[in-house]
Amino acid sequence: MEHESKTKMDGIEMEKGKKENGSRKGVEITMRVLALVLTMVAATVLGVAKQTEVVPIKLIPTLPPLNVATTAKASYLSAFVYNICANAIACGYTAISIMIVIISKGRRSKCLLMAVLIGDLMMVALLCSSTGAAGAIGLMGRHGNKHVMWKKVCGVFGKFCNQAAVSVAITLIASVVFMLLVVLDALKLP
């Protein structure tokens, strides 16, 4: 049996075009699901990060140090709260964009393509800015700052700092996935 295919006026086979569109849509949905999972995990890891340790505090040089239980939580630092919120927003947006991609079934208009492209671009900006903010605070906690007499806290709160570092790294990976989605969206524009 011969394989029959319909050709357009310019000679491109329609079946081949349908297969390419289907595989592109599959790649796009896979990348969006990956972005959804990454942002959800990043927000959760940082959101539940909490560690309590007993810290010796020396009030007067002649007296022994006073042991005080101190807790490190992401909600105590605005940059970490921003990172959690940015990941939650990106996660919600990704869920909506997955539904749009699935429902549209490849028949997306130019306006819808542009809206998704702009949304993806906004997520890149949001996630990159939150990565920078949380990363800066994380580095301050890990290395301290001699100029303003801020001491390292990751020596005491190691588990908390490691969770924050993992969350920041996952957020950075999610922003790269969104950047790849922007490129994919731009290639689809007529």
From Swiss-Prot:
Please indicate the ranges of residues that lie on the Cytoplasmic side.
1-28, 105-111, 185-190
Keyword annotations for this protein, in alphabetical order, are: Cell membrane, Membrane, Transmembrane, Transmembrane helix
* Region of interest (Disordered), residue spans: 1-21
Q: Does the keyword Transmembrane apply?
A: yes
Residue ranges that the UniProt entry lists as topological domain Extracellular: 50-83, 133-163
Report the superkingdom from the record: Eukaryota
Pfam families assigned to the protein according to its UniProt record, in alphabetical order: CASP_dom
Membrane-topology descriptor? Multi-pass membrane protein
Q: Which GO terms describe its cellular component?
A: plasma membrane
A GO molecular function term, named singly, is: protein histidine kinase binding
Q: Tell me where in or outside the cell this protein is found.
A: Cell membrane
Q: What's the chief localization of this chain?
A: membrane
Transmembrane annotation, as ranges: 29-49, 84-104, 112-132, 164-184
Q: How does it assemble?
A: Homodimer and heterodimers.
- Report the family membership: Belongs to the Casparian strip membrane proteins (CASP) family.
Q: What is this protein called?
A: CASP-like protein 1E1
